[in-house]
């Protein structure tokens, strides 16, 4: 008899899976009700303003990405799952608090920010000409959910997760640096 969360893990065994695999697993889990959503007004407003900013600036690809992330995001949700013997289990998906966004191109940074805002995390962005130009144009609610740092490699830089867009050599170097962090 499978455990209550079993269907959620089966998709991890596939070499390729549908983009909405988690949503399918949650829908077929026998959950009796819609999930409880635990997001602050600031999280909700930042995601809304980021999408609106993209729309106001004619960035239809970014708007579509924001919509897709919003539809698929399960960050901050709790679902009740029925167990094999009538027990009830809760399954919560909580976003990482601080997500380091590493991108050399503005378009890549925008995609990262769309993901971070959709799940309800706060972005940590290394200062650069590209990031400074973009961040200065963003709405206030979005800017409040972004921390700028001069040097992400500093031991004082605080983040829980990393999103990287860039050259494989940069990824390798960044991964080695992250592995050395205490």
Feature names for model-found ranges:
Residues 1-102, 106-112, 119-182:
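C-terminal segments
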